[in-house]
Amino acid sequence: KLFSIIVLIFVLIISCNEQKKSSTSYLEISNKSQIDSITQTFIDREIYPFIYTRLEDSNGTVAYENLAKNERLLADENIDGDSWIRIWSMSKIVTICLALDLMEDGIISLDDSVIKYIPEFSDLKVATTQDSMEIPSVNWYEEDSNRLGPCPLSYVENDSVMTILHLLNHQAGFYYSTTNIDCIDSVIANENLAAAENSQDLINKMAKLPLIQHSGSYYYYGTNTTVLGLVCERATGKTLAELVKERITDPMKIEGLAYDLPKEATMLPRFSGKDSILRIAKEGELDIFGQNVPDYDSEHQLYLGGEGMIATANGYSDFLRMLLNKGTLNGYRFLEENTIDDLTAPHTQKDNSYGHNGYNLWVSKEPYLEKGRGDKGLWIGGGYEGTHFWIDTKRGFVGTIMTQMFWVYDGDYGYTKDDRIRGAIYEPWTQIPYSKN
């Protein structure tokens, strides 16, 4: 009996340690009404369908949360920190951290060749323009009457060995169907990657596509992290969903971060402002893959490491707190501190005055502070449907701004959402108001 009592006391102590320390956060937000008001402007102008903002301190205590929503479109929707959100590229940092965990265990390494795990990619060619240039060497969104168009394309051998490091840094040569070059966008659209049956089918589809550059030559944002997820699967013999559950969500007791929508749960609609009016997005309108988008169906065993996760603000904040706490959460060490340091160290875009890229994690510099958009040293990321996060290691908190919006029609104001809201949060600390210029 005495032994049972001791065990019970031990369990209670552990349980208390796993729960939030206090209902009151050490992080003081003194201007909540100002933040609420700025957020509401994006709703009143019918630029966004809803905006849910949440700040959590390192203990998981909510220091601030606010929902502003369009009553015309979402009157009957209850949106809060437990609502499931399509997070798109906010999946990338999860997959990257998973890969870093596998590296700590010696299962993969930065210098490993990608074809060691995916031999189907051994014959990938590099697409070049009719001027024999690498496609990322030119901004194809800018008009220039003095240059030839990129099409028709030519195809050459990749002059470098594609490595896992290239995947981490978006330098491998993979891309989305948004290059603004029809003869390459149409090729990836025709393969309809998000409709692949499983990882093998996805690999088969991607093996038919050209690379957009020689591996290692440029930073070019695309499906590189999706391929990284495929490498993790091949290296372990497990699916990404299994790896996330076994290595991340279960041991760190994170709920609200997954690939499949739980039974009985629902997803919010996709919205678009492409016609200068806020409305439900049309089928096929989200064109990042050219055709289909992820369906989050548990029967569809395709796990896109760069785009395919869903999360609640509550659950995703827990994952961010692991990074804030230098690799630990709820008494479990997931990554070593030196791994977190490497994750946020300068890897690409080192000469950008606004910040640098770690492993797909933006680290802000002085202009964020000077222009009233937050502070320097913030770790920042976001997703295709307007989701956003940041980590403030100086003040010890994480922030998420959630919405589900594809095309912002009033881009001049609409795309300042994250900077304006974040700027308002920081204004009492920095005494610097938001400045667009």
Description of each model-found segment:
Residues 13-15:
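C-terminal motif of bacterial Sec signal peptides marking the signal peptidase cleavage site
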Residues 325, 339, 344-349, 366-370, ...:
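Short, gly/Ser/Thr-rich active-site loops of penicillin-recognizing serine hydrolases
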Residues 1-8:
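Sec-dependent signal peptide recognition
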Residues 63-66, 396-409:
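Short, well-ordered beta-strand elements
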Residues 28-87, 107, 123-131, 410-411:
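Short, conserved catalytic-motif segment at the N-terminal edge
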Residues 39, 54, 59, 86-114, ...:
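Active-site SXXK
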Residues 123-376:
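Short, surface-exposed loop or secondary-structure junction motifs
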Residues 378, 385-398:
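Short, surface-exposed beta-strand/loop micro-motifs that present aromatic residues
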